[in-house]
């Protein structure tokens, strides 16, 4: 249901999972993402914290908490924590994605691109990882590669939920490669 964009149905389904399994990290993180999308930041934070308490060593729970905490916290502390976690799990897609997000907030595009590339290398069908890699390539003035990854992000978004606006990607693709319109 989440893949089809049925957010309210997805929310109910994940809440049912939590009734059976109160510490299900995947359900907690999914509910955090849903709450974030619905503009309920306190609920999202609560779910991320519950996921981390339920499974402190889970890379996705760690990344979700660090990714959102990094917007408010000292970026140097967040970067140090992410790098420490990555030293033990260098191929972790969510940790690399969180590090890329931290770098992008600081306009450190070359470093962001590398972190996003690491996420895509480990989980190449994640539309958000592909999209953020495309954005970083776009900022690094690599229009051909950016366009390629924007297209891959759109293809992946047809199969999995994505946090980006598909219409904006289509518009950006037309700006990058006007001759390749469908």
Identify the residue ranges that each predicted region occupies.
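Canonical tetratricopeptide repeat
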Residues: 30, 64-67, 98, 132, ...
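Short, highly charged
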Residues: 1-54, 59-60, 64
């Amino acid at each position: 249901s989440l893949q089809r964009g049925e957010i309210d149905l997805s929310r109910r389904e994940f809440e049912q999972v939590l009734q059976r399994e109160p510490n299900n990290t995947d359900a907690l993180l999914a509910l955090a993402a849903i709450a974030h999308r619905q503009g309920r930041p306190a609920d999202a934070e609560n779910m991320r914290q519950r996921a981390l308490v339920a499974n402190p060593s889970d890379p996705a729970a760690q990344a979700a908490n660090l990714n959102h905490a990094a917007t408010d916290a000292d970026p140097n502390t967040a970067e140090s924590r992410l790098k420490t976690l990555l030293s033990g799990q260098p191929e972790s897609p969510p940790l690399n994605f969180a590090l890329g997000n931290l770098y992008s907030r600081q306009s450190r595009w070359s470093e962001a691109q590398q972190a996003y590339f690491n996420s895509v290398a480990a989980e190449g069908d994640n539309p958000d990882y592909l999209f953020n890699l495309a954005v970083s390539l776009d900022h690094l003035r690599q229009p051909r590669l950016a366009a390629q990854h924007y297209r891959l992000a759109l293809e992946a978004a047809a199969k999995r939920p994505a946090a980006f606006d598909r219409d904006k990607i289509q518009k950006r693709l037309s700006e990058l490669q006007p001759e390749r319109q469908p």
